[in-house]
Each structure stands twice: as structure tokens, then as C-alpha cells.
């Protein structure tokens, strides 16, 4: 499957991230059963990453690249685009499909 992007609320429809730009996002990560494993919103601190530098999982690289500034979307990410057979011990089980609620706040 890779990554499926479903818009929760639209962005400006014009400003899309490009490789090398810093994406500033708020997110909540959940397992398929709805169990939350991480949230920048809970920390009240947006998360930043540089698109194309492999600082995040492949599902984020490809999913966030399809979003425009201001957009909030549900990213459903298959294990091969997330943490695969290894998972993330103690947090994400092996072969887990992940669901992220991501809002692209701005680009830097």
C-alpha cells in the first residue's frame, strides 16, 4: 500500500514542500487499534524535519510531500513504509500499519 493520504481539512492548495525544505508539522501517531504512541500536540511543540534527508519514515517523506501548507491529513502507512518487521521495540510492534494525523503548519 505504501502511504494513503486522506484530507481532514484542506491547505492552501498551492504551497507544497520541496526536497531540502524544512517541514514544520503537528502530528499524532496511532496504531491501527487507535492506541496513541506519540504526539507533538501533547508536547505542545511542533516537529521539524527536512524533506528528502531520510530523517523520517518513508511514509512521511511521501505523504507530507503531497500536502499543502495548512492541510491536515490522515496518513495510513503500511509497515514497509514505516518500521517494517523490526518495529520500534516497546512502542511499535513488528509489521504494524501506522496512522498519523498530520498538520503541515509551515515550511522553512
Swiss-Prot record:
Swiss-Prot/TrEMBL GO biological process terms: amyloid fibril formation; cytokine-mediated signaling pathway; heart morphogenesis; heart trabecula formation; muscle contraction; negative regulation of activin receptor signaling pathway; negative regulation of protein phosphorylation; negative regulation of release of sequestered calcium ion into cytosol
Class of the enzyme per the UniProt entry, highest EC level: isomerase
Domain PPIase FKBP-type: residue ranges: 20-108
Keyword set includes Cytoplasm: yes
Family that this chain belongs to: Belongs to the FKBP-type PPIase family. FKBP1 subfamily.
Membrane topology: Peripheral membrane protein
Keyword Protein biosynthesis on entry: no
GO MF annotation terms: activin binding; calcium channel inhibitor activity; FK506 binding; peptidyl-prolyl cis-trans isomerase activity; protein homodimerization activity; SMAD binding; transmembrane transporter binding
Subunit structure and binding partners: Interacts with TGFBR1; prevents TGFBR1 phosphorylation by TGFBR2 and stabilizes it in the inactive conformation. Interacts with ACVR1B and SMAD7. Identified in a complex composed of RYR1, PDE4D, PKA, FKBP1A and protein phosphatase 1 (PP1). Interacts directly with RYR2 and RYR3. Interacts with GLMN; rapamycin and FK506 abolish the interaction with GLMN in a dose dependent manner. Interacts directly with RYR1.
EC numbers, comma separated: 5.2.1.8
General function of this protein: Keeps in an inactive conformation TGFBR1, the TGF-beta type I serine/threonine kinase receptor, preventing TGF-beta receptor activation in absence of ligand. May modulate the RYR1 calcium channel activity. PPIases accelerate the folding of proteins. It catalyzes the cis-trans isomerization of proline imidic peptide bonds in oligopeptides.
Name of this chain's protein: Peptidyl-prolyl cis-trans isomerase FKBP1A
Chief place of localization: cytoplasm
Catalytically driven reaction(s): [protein]-peptidylproline (omega=180) = [protein]-peptidylproline (omega=0)
Notes on how activity is controlled: Inhibited by both FK506 and rapamycin.
UniProt cross-references to InterPro entries, sorted A to Z: FKBP-type_PPIase, PPIase_dom_sf, PPIase_FKBP_dom
GO cellular component, one term: extracellular exosome
Modified residues (N6-acetyllysine): 53
Residues with PTM N6-succinyllysine: 53
Keyword tags: Acetylation, Cytoplasm, Isomerase, Membrane, Rotamase, Sarcoplasmic reticulum
Domain of life of the organism encoding this protein: Eukaryota
Species per Swiss-Prot/TrEMBL record: Bos taurus
Location of the protein in the cell: Cytoplasm, Cytosol; Sarcoplasmic reticulum membrane
